């Protein structure tokens, strides 16, 4: 057999941007306990430390323990005020939650003012993308193992009280997520 020489080939460079696809996105300030919550809800093993921006890349976990369905949860790095304008690598972080179906707003009840935290976080989401404020939202008040968090919880009934560190309230949160995703599937 004899092969004939082919024609010169083409060469091109492409830059692809990967955006995570997950069912649920955990959104909150640095040190709100998002990575600890991901670990409590799934079998994921993200890096956890008590300094801001421990999480620099999104972490994924699959929640399925004893649930009628399984779903993927994305823990994105902490959002700070000005994130939608690129402050603190905010745009790099926010783009990952655009493709989630449901947002879980994680607020540190031990240290933050829940109303102000929610205002800032939802404002950053709205400034980044028109589609993000339209997504279903579950509010979580984290760090309920601390006395100062419990004091605030009674005044803020719209939040599911959770302690990611002790797993208190995680079953209620998983049930709320499952119910919301189920309603969305039926719609």
PLM segments and residue spans:
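Loop/turn-to-beta-strand initiation segments
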Residues: 68-71, 101-102, 135-138
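Conserved G1/Walker A P-loop phosphate-binding module
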Residues: 1-83, 87, 91, 95-97, ...
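Generic enzyme active-site microenvironment
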Residues: 73, 106, 140
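Canonical P-loop GTPase G-domain recognition
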Residues: 135-138, 145-187
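Conserved nucleotide-binding/hydrolysis micro-motifs of P-loop NTPases
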Residues: 21, 62, 77-80, 108-114, ...
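Conserved Switch II/interswitch segment of TRAFAC-class P-loop GTPases
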Residues: 99-120, 131-133, 144-149
């Amino acid at each position: 057999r004899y092969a004939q020489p082919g024609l010169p080939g083409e060469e091109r460079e492409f830059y692809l941007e990967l955006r995570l696809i997950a069912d649920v996105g955990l959104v909150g300030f640095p040190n709100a306990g998002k990575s600890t919550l991901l670990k409590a809800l799934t079998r994921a093993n993200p890096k956890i430390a008590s300094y801001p921006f421990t999480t620099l890349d999104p972490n994924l976990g699959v929640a399925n323990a004893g649930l009628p369905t399984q779903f993927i949860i994305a823990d994105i790095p902490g959002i700070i005020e000005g994130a939608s304008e690129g402050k603190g690598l905010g745009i790099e972080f926010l783009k990952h939650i655009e493709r989630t179906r449901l947002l879980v707003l994680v607020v540190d009840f031990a240290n933050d003012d829940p109303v102000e935290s929610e205002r800032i976080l939802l404002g950053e989401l709205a400034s980044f993308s028109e589609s993000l404020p339209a997504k279903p939202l579950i509010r979580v008040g984290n760090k309920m193992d601390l006395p100062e968090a419990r004091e605030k919880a009674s005044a803020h009934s719209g939040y599911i009280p959770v302690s990611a560190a002790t797993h208190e309230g995680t079953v209620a949160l998983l049930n709320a997520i499952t119910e919301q995703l189920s309603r969305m599937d039926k719609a």
